Amino acid sequence: MATKCELFGIRKKGYIEDILETVGLEGVGKKKTKHFSLGMKQRLGIGLALVGEPDLLVLDEPINGLDPQGIAEVRDTIQRLRDERNMTILISSHILEELSKIATDYGIIHNGSLLQELTSEELMKRCSERIEIELIHPEQAVPILDRMGFTNYQVTD
């Protein structure tokens, strides 16, 4: 991290310590990174990305391969950056359950193309729980569902 600070011309006393504190690594001292857990290494990588104080942070699968504690630590770091620094964070991940705990907006990409952009509320509505019922006469289900007050349903043959 010191080398990257040097490359950016940053010589402010305590700068590295502030970044380490931001990513929850304030207590590591001179500990060698080879002794870091995977979660600690992920947070160190985020810390390195923070050198120079960017407005946008891009993270590719930041929780992939982490144990539950590591996931929680990285999630807390991301939330802290979002809330305390008002930072925009673009996360590429296939783990929607975990993203739902921190994301405000989603972009669905398939084969390199952006298919759809959704707010977290829109995504939750589209992914809400559902039941599937097989009926002999599915057309008879519509009036019953309407009388029961259901509005978000689909009847298929």
Each predicted region: which residue ranges?
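ABC transporter nucleotide-binding domains
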Residues: 1-91, 96-110, 114-116
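Short, solvent-exposed coil/turn segments
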Residues: 18, 126-128
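Short, surface-exposed, polar/charged, turn-prone segments marking secondary-structure boundaries
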Residues: 85-87, 117-119, 134-137, 144
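Short acidic-hydrophobic catalytic motif
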Residues: 121-125
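Short, charged/small-residue-rich alpha-helical element at the C-terminal edge
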Residues: 129-157
